[in-house]
Amino acid sequence: MIINHPSLDQKPTAVRWWICALLFFATTINYIDRQVFAILAPQLQTEIGWSEIEYGYIVTAFQLSYAIGLLMVGKLIDFLGTKKGFILSIIVWSLAAMAHALARTPIGFGLARLALGIGESGNFPAAIKTISEWFPRKERALATGIFNSGSNIGAIVAPLLVPIIALNFGWQAAFILTGLLGFIWLFFWLRLMSRPEENVSINAAELDLIKADTEEDLEKPTSIWKIIRTRKIWAIAIGKFMTDPIWWFFLYWLPKFLNTTYGLKLDKIGLPLIVAYLIADVGSVGGGWLSSHFLQMGWSINAARKTTLLICAILVVPIYWASGIDDLWPAVILIGLGMAAHTGWSANMYTLATDFFPKKDMGTVVGFIGMAGAVGGMLMASATGHLLQATGSYKILFVIAASMYGIALIIIHLLVPNIDAEKS
């Protein structure tokens, strides 16, 4: 008599993709709350009267607390689990986002950014850990690309939403109303999120798919001191230290660049920002899809990931010419292409973490590499403020943006010549 395994007769449910959708919306809200300040910066600079250096310090305050938060929160999420960790994170960052409405001085905004950085630092460690728990290896790059694209959607929604609120109800209302979005998301997270084996909506076929190439999470998380003694953690950390600052630069200075270079005010700045981030969104999903597609073609993990990273590094190079273009839209297209290359790069950098390390360590690993990126962003923010105050020119900043990815890829390859030999 033939006994059929129940899961072999079933079509897998798609609960994991609903979880991915929740991560996407969390990341979208994360970036809306982060972007409000940058969009309002030209107006606030006129109203409050801070200098380029002071603006750089305010941005640095966020980067500093974000870096510190990533180092601490990764271990906390490994301890609490993804569900509780995300709850704590989004409550803190939503309250901090609304607290910006109380600020009246550069110091006040700096304190609000410090609190926001601590809260928002939980998003990516919790999201990547969730991906490692809910997706088989072959789907992780695509799932990461999808949720990571929320960063671009958030940056698209913010220029649509913030000017309307600010022009009609004042800039304080823009911070308060966008800050409330996190509590709406929290309702769905509480109802839908659980571990795969505990979820009542998942069937045996999907659970088998998820568990096909993942280790059982029975051991305690590895010590961070043991993790940082490996070359593979430094490959990702250095890669993010060199390239995350480029993303932070565009997140916080693109509205000001458009304002100072092309004279765009709050009521006109939305469309160019939306176009740039729409292009960037294609890069996030496309970069994740391309890497997963290479694996499905039978490529090794090493070839799939590094080829995708190389393509992204090449596509970012044309951004070099953006600062010298007199016409608005060609510059926006080039910047959008560079941002798309970054988001494709970023999706694969996070996927490398799931390639290299077991899911029990994912919060710690993502926290550490995220901290490295935030430290790079902190240094970039401070240097950008001083550079713009001294020269008023963005040229050198675009040169840096165009060159960092290729250099970072060389370092990654030297540290980890064969990803397949290092995979978890």
Question: Where do the language-model regions lie?
Answer:
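Helix-breaking motifs and short loop linkers at transmembrane-helix boundaries and internal kinks
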Residues: 49, 81, 102-108, 119, ...
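Conserved MFS/SLC helix-loop-helix module at the cytosolic interface between two early adjacent transmembrane helices
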Residues: 68-107
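Extracytoplasmic
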Residues: 18-52, 250-255
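Cytoplasmic helix-loop-helix junction between adjacent transmembrane helices
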Residues: 112-152
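Extracytoplasmic gate region of multi-pass secondary transporters
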Residues: 37-38, 230-287, 342-346, 350, ...
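Helix-loop-helix hairpin linking two adjacent transmembrane segments in secondary transporters
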Residues: 147-200
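Residue-level signature of mid-helix packing/kink "hotspots" within the transmembrane helices
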Residues: 35, 63-71, 155-156, 277-281, ...
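C-terminal ends and interior cores of transmembrane alpha-helices
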Residues: 91-104, 310-326
